[in-house]
Amino acid sequence: DLIDLHENLYPRPDLFPDALHPIKEGAAILAQTVYGNITKDFGGLKLAAVFTDNMVLQRQQPIQIYGTANGGDLVEVTFKQQKKSTITDRYGKWKITFPAQVHGGPYEVSIRSNQKNIVLKNILVGDIWFCSGQSNMAFQLQNSENGAAEVKKAIAQSTIRLFQGKAIRETDDTPWDSITLAKTNQLKFFSGSWSTCDSTSVKEFSAIAYYFGKNIAHEENVPVGLIQIAVGGSPIESWIDRYTLEHDDKVVDLLTNWRKSDFIMPWVRERAGVNLKNATNTK
């Protein structure tokens, strides 16, 4: 069988300075990929990052639970007294689909493999809204008009759940350190998990997203999950995946020497120059 070395390296052009030969980190990824395919050891049962305690699953749509496990493992998922199972593919990937559900909860989701069992608790079924944008979307509830009072009342919003993707660094006017630069190259821009709505979780959450979600929960009378991914000053091009950029004649040139490209707004290039001042990869 052929081993797919493309998938893990495609998002990392920084590992190929001459566009052909990988640096040490790239060679390590190649070796780990070969090892996993030969041994079927992909690190055991794991869920995609969006599946955690306190999450919301979309109502009235088929519900998909997915992740990775070791190659050939049996994975069983139990939800609302329904049990479904599948065998992971040769790369350790798995996905299980449950029928569409009406709103409700709280529920538990149990995921079991040959070696591990994961139980997700306090799950609701309702409507999920993706809240993305620049600094206007990132503007925190605690800093809004009457925000302090709203933060204190947030615990009453028991059917609102929050997933705040926290950026590894702000795009402020300072150079990033080596750890931030390494995580950026690894595409580890955000971290986060679902949380209930209370005075701690909501104070730094998007004010726009929170008030929107509060109104939706009241008007529709269903649980609401809000996913915040917002980066101040981010251009629209940064929200488009690499494959789409590469395969569109109108925007493909954005990927060529982008820090000096007229296709990128001058203020974006200027700030990128500051943030990436300590980068060893000049591209």
Q: Where is each model-derived feature located?
A:
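Catalytic His-Asp segment of secreted/periplasmic serine-dependent ester chemistry enzymes
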Residues: 1-42
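Cell-envelope and extracellular/periplasmic
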Residues: 1, 7-10, 41-283
